[in-house]
Amino acid sequence: MIPFKFHHTALAVLALVVFSTTVPAQTLPPLPADSRIKKGNLPCGVVYYTVTNPSDKGYADIAVIQRDQPSSAAPTGQVSAAFLSRMGVSPGPEGYISDVDGSTVYHFRDIPFYKPEVLDSMLLYSFLQVALSKAQQAVVVSGDIDPVEIKKKMDIFSMMVPKMLVKEAHRPDYVWESSPAPWVEAYPSDSPVARVSVTYSGARVPFEFMNTAQAIVSDLFGDELQLVLRHRLERNLQDAGIPHGLIDIHSLRSDDYGSDEQYTVAVTVAKENTDAAMRVLSTTLAEVDSRGVTPQEFTDAKKVLTPQVRHRAVGIPSRVDDIQRCTANFLYGASLAPYSETMRYFSRKTLADTTETRFFNNFADALLSQLENLKLEFTGAPDSLDKDQELFNYNLAYLFGSVVPTEKDHSWHSADSSALKVSCPRVKIKSEKKEAVTGGTLWTFTNGMRVIFKPVPGSGVFHYGLQLGGGLAQIPDLKEGEGGYIGDMLSLYDVADIPAAQFRDLLASGGVSMETELSVNSFSLKGEAPSGQFQFFLKSLIALANRRKVNPSQYQLYSRNQALAQPSMQDLLYQKLVPGFVYTTNKLPGKLTLDTQKKAEKYFEERFSRMQDGILILSGDLKEEEVKRLLMRYLGGFRTDKSTLPRRAVALRPLSGTTQQTVEGYPAGIYILLDAEYAVTSDHYYTSFVAMEALRRSLARHLAPYGYSIELETNNFTQPQERFQIEITLRPIPSDNLPEDVRTQDPERALSAVHAALASCASEPLSGADLSGWKARTLSQVKRELDSPSGFVTTLLTRYTSNKDIYSRYSESISAIDAAQVKDFLTALTSGGRIVLLVP
């Protein structure tokens, strides 16, 4: 094993090699800061950050960071939930106040900056918190802001703060100390499942390297290690015949907090498999530690990771992400570089794969060890679990994994695509016309298939959607709670004689994502892929449509894994709303049988044999002539059976009135589903987003004394009835993070406040400023969605699935929204069906 204190030196060497074309020997320059971020010192000495983030028009977040002052010692008495709710500000999941590694962070989210008086009040309020503390402090403002004007206001408000000397972030007291004694904890419970987790600790990135390429190298290696461990653990559990639920692999890095880095690998299994799962987990870690990975496995892992890195590089970070990055910079000296810097390093080919693999293996070897720097936890463990015996078993399994070589190939088989070779009759374009709503081009081919294409250059990827019509209502004898499993069956087939798991790996290593979406009346596949993989995507889709074969072992594994899962809260709410309705994507325990797979295969065969009934939507960084050429070459490989299928009528009878229950086994909170029959028109669709903001404001005001975070989501359905729904999730905030004027978190009293908010929200006065601000926010979100390739695909899938055009006049529809429309919508939703689930 490599001593951990040397692994950061190795990473620094790697960073030097990678950037050797621009970096003088023996130095690593600081990374360039994101151009959206401005940093400096106010006249009082407080550090400020302004971050331009246009993701939400008219909204911003403010944070105050008090270094080395824990929240228990911070002057939080001036934080008032009542005042903040009047400003239209509700707490996030962590509350208004949180302790971050011994420092206090005040975070005020979703502030309606479209109101000048709210902007000034919240800035003044934030500087009041600054003035009450003698700690070294920073103020962060991120959102739809004019950074110059915000800086002017901060200069004025800083005059009320006594001048202070603010030092740069530092951690002079940090010293890495290896822990030779493992730590074992067991937490028994009555749950039928148990969670086994292993956490390894390692030295953090040295302070002087936090804003250099070494931090990027360390983070990327950490991401790749997590990916490798997940992939291996899934396969090893499968080979051992151990059903599992969630595999949770996460980490705390050097920019997350000020102590050691931590990497956690956890798996949920049936309680009787606790010991066996722990052994597999130990053996998996030992294999990576002792023998490392092959260049092929490492290269494949990088390919699988590429979409994630690219998304971060081209997307706009959330305001919460901006706040966290600025907090890490102030507390630990972390980089403010844009994520494009990570992509720049990730894409460079300076090193041979074998050399980079060797560095990666050194990184993994330095982190993972047999019993050093280790915490072993059993949550929901059997009462009889012996911690000493489990530690012995872990050690024994680790020795076995270290000594006994494995014959398995752990790569993603990225080069094994030859089986997808297909010979297709050529087709021609029969007609071509502009798609009226989105500006794309609609091609109809001689075999009847239709394709809509819109080029959006520059991203290096394309998005796709294949809509095939005929949803769950076309499946005879479907059982309640069975429909949610149907879509998953598509991932359990062998394809073109490639085993199911290997085909999934092949898609992943090619950067091709494929998500199945089912509803009452439609079936869609959607995802994205690198631009250079368009031909591979078409060949994969043809193989999936025509050359599927049921894999019984994959079904058995999936079935056993699903037996450990519980219904999602969303599934539970919907099942309570429409008991007995079978055509939903709910997954209910005990409803998955061999008949489910047979129903799914018959259904998929009907859909894939009639490809002319659907439509393929493409948008992204593709050249039109190349797209045409490949479509004419490959679309003839799809089947276009001209026979028709009968359509089945579906009746829906949701409950009316209020149904309330107490349930257990979910995170504590109040979960509500509002449902009403309401025409799905363009006007109503956009009104739903504005009305949701009015509801959020009412909930924030009524819940201010009770300490709950608020999450809202709106949905609509066109089949079998036109309906709108609003899902409300309210979770209690940790008590240490609450203002002093929060009286109680009693869920019954909080629920009474929720019902009061629902009863009054439709009649509460709506100011012109709020209505204009909410409409502007909705307009900017819709426009940004339509301008993106993924939004283009989603928009057209929605249109062809629902036969509704809600986008062609979106600007006019949003502009026309008035207070009466908002009132009508809220009246309908709050007087319709209401499911309330209380989790104590």
State what each model feature region is.
Residues M1-L11:
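Bacterial N-terminal signal peptides that target proteins for export
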Residues L11-S20:
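Bacterial N-terminal signal peptides
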Residues P24-T52, A135-V141, I145-D219, R230, ...:
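Proteolytic maturation boundary segments
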Residues D56-Q129, K134-S142, A194-A215, L233-T354, ...:
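M16 family metallopeptidases and their MPP-like homologs
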Residues S218, G222, Q226, R701:
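Long, His/Glu/Asp-enriched segments that create or flank divalent metal/ion-associated functional microenvironments
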Residues V550-L557, T644:
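Conserved short beta-strand edge segments in small beta-sheet-based binding/regulatory domains
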